[in-house]
């Protein structure tokens, strides 16, 4: 029987699932087994019936084998689970749902937006995106894989409650994630059902508000990303705008005024059913780590599909005010820079931003983190921006090194296959964002250090001299010199730079084992090969 792998140092075991985040996961005093109906010794009598689960809000749920709403963030790998993940979100999920959908279409002719939000095509697209994103379960304990079975049983009931205005969103589940600058950031995880409904609203409302957003806003918008924001700042720096107003909003998502936000939404949305549903999501509350429920009179919970759109709606007046004053700026969610040519203008711009944010938006500017400084000294979206290039910030490099150290820790007792798989996925994701930097020296330095960490892991895993000798010979080391390395008393870190070890564990061989080649990825992004011209058709022979 294979030995179970141990978790990374400082992380929870993957087998523990979502239910054991931070060592506890309660819902008003009930255990996860009591909420989902999975038999754990204290569940209801219904939970002992095979394939039956008790949903805390919607009642009994017949779940096919392999689709029990377990506390997992990923499907279990069974054929039934894989099939469920590919299932379309059919509106005719339960008895009477087909007639309900028809009545909905006939009875909503006065509101095209509401009809579009609940249309089968829009709900199917919302479910597809939620399924692709995955994520942890909400307070009801239902995973993404278990949602199709839930919808087949209760889809008609959910649609009926949405239609007659009696649907009540569930509170979000509070979880904490570490910040790059230290401390922890609170996230609110909605249930899968609420994620689908929020995503359906966001898809339709996004088209309504997209035309109202500023060209200097780059977050959570189609065809725009953080790289575009960084390029815009670099273009401004190249024009001589080298002084920056680096303004930080104190806990923006936790301090959004609901009345102001709903007034902004109501400027474009007239349907009271849409406005009522958005307001209920804002006031749904949060279940804390200790199981207590807390009201949310202010703020937008981070973690839901609707939150990014609401953040852009809330901050659009700030964009328009800066544009009215002729300021050059770039905003990505609540992170933004205002660019000016000199220090005097920067001080004046800082006063304008503080007065508008605190007076009109009723938000707070974090004076400890806001400053006026040279652009090259400011960090924006993890990068330092100069006139001619974009560099990685020290915090971004430290984050990379810390994560790679954990993944290549000599005390993490897992196979090299799993270790390198985790390393490859992390490096590909990290570099996919930070590849915009044009600092070749940083790329080479990080790549060299990462490969040294991997060679250290191999040397540690081989342990004894005979094993090391046999492995080196198998990898092509010279027989007359291999004993010099295999019998060395030097530590693993020092041996990772040994010429014999490096000649055996070459960069090319490490790449075949799953170690990414950072210089090759960087060159492929910044200097892509030219497209080959299409071959010309042979000329026709002249007819005499």
Task: Kindly give the residue locations of the regions a language model identified.
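A conserved non-catalytic segment of reverse transcriptases
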Residues: 283, 360-430
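Core structural elements
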Residues: 118-121, 171-175, 180, 282, ...
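Extended C-terminal regions of large enzymes
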Residues: 458, 462-544
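Conserved polymerase palm-domain catalytic core
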Residues: 157-176, 180-181, 204, 212-377
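Non-catalytic, polymerase-adjacent accessory regions of viral genome-replication enzymes
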Residues: 1-152, 156
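Short amphipathic alpha-helical coiled-coil/interface segments
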Residues: 151, 155, 446-454
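Short, solvent-exposed helix-loop connector elements
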Residues: 295-300, 405-419, 429-442, 459-466
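A glycine-rich phosphate-binding loop feature that marks nucleotide/adenosyl-phosphate handling sites
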Residues: 369-378, 422-426, 443-451, 466-475
């Amino acid at each position: 029987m294979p030995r179970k792998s141990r978790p990374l140092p400082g992380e929870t075991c993957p087998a523990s699932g979502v239910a054991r985040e931070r060592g506890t996961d309660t819902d008003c005093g009930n255990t996860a087994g009591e909420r989902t109906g999975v038999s754990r010794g204290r569940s209801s009598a219904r939970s002992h019936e095979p394939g039956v689960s008790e949903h805390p809000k919607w009642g009994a749920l017949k779940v096919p084998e392999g689709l029990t709403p377990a506390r997992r963030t990923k499907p279990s790998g069974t054929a039934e689970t894989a099939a469920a993940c590919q299932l379309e979100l059919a509106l005719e999920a339960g008895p009477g749902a087909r007639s309900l959908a028809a009545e909905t279409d006939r009875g909503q002719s006065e509101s095209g937006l509401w009809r579009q939000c609940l249309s089968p095509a829009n709900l199917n697209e919302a479910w597809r995106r939620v399924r692709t994103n995955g994520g942890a379960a909400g307070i009801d304990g239902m995973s993404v894989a278990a949602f199709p079975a839930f919808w087949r049983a209760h889809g008609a009931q959910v649609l009926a409650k949405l239609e007659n205005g009696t649907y009540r969103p569930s509170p979000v589940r509070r979880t904490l994630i570490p910040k790059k600058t230290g401390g922890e950031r609170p996230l609110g995880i909605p249930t899968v059902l609420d994620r689908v409904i929020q995503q359906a609203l966001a898809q339709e409302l996004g088209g309504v508000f997209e035309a109202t957003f500023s060209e200097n806003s780059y977050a959570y918008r189609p065809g725009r990303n953080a790289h575009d924001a960084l390029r815009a700042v670099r273009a401004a720096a190249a024009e001589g705008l080298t002084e920056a107003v680096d303004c930080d909003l104190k806990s923006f998502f936790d301090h959004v005024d609901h009345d102001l936000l709903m007034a902004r939404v109501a400027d474009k949305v007239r349907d009271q059913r849409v406005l009522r549903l958005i307001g209920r999501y804002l006031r749904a509350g949060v279940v804390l780590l200790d199981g207590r429920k807390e009201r949310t009179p202010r703020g937008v919970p981070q973690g839901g599909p609707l939150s990014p759109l609401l953040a852009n709606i809330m901050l659009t007046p700030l964009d328009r005010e800066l544009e009215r004053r002729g300021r050059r700026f770039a905003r990505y969610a609540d992170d933004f820079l205002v660019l000016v040519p000199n220090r005097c203008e920067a001080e004046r711009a800082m006063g304008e931003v503080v007065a508008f944010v605190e007076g009109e938006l009723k938000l707070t500017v974090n004076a400890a983190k806001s400053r006026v400084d040279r652009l090259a000294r400011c960090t924006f979206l993890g990068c330092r921006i100069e006139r001619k290039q974009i560099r990685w910030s020290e915090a971004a490099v430290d984050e990379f090194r810390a994560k790679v150290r954990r993944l290549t820790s000599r005390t993490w007792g897992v196979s090299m296959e799993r270790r390198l798989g985790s390393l490859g996925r992390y490096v590909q994701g990290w570099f996919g964002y930070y590849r915009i930097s044009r600092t070749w020296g940083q790329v080479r330095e990080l790549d060299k250090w990462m490969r040294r960490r991997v060679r250290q892991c191999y040397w540690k895993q081989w342990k004894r001299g005979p094993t090391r000798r046999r492995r080196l010979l198998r990898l092509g080391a010279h027989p007359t010199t291999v004993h010099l390395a295999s019998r060395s008393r030097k530590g693993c870190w020092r041996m990772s730079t040994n010429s014999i070890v490096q000649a055996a564990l070459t960069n090319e061989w490490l790449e075949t084992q799953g170690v990414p080649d950072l210089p090759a990825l960087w060159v492929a992004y910044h200097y892509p090969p030219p497209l080959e011209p299409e071959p010309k058709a042979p000329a026709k022979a002249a007819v005499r």
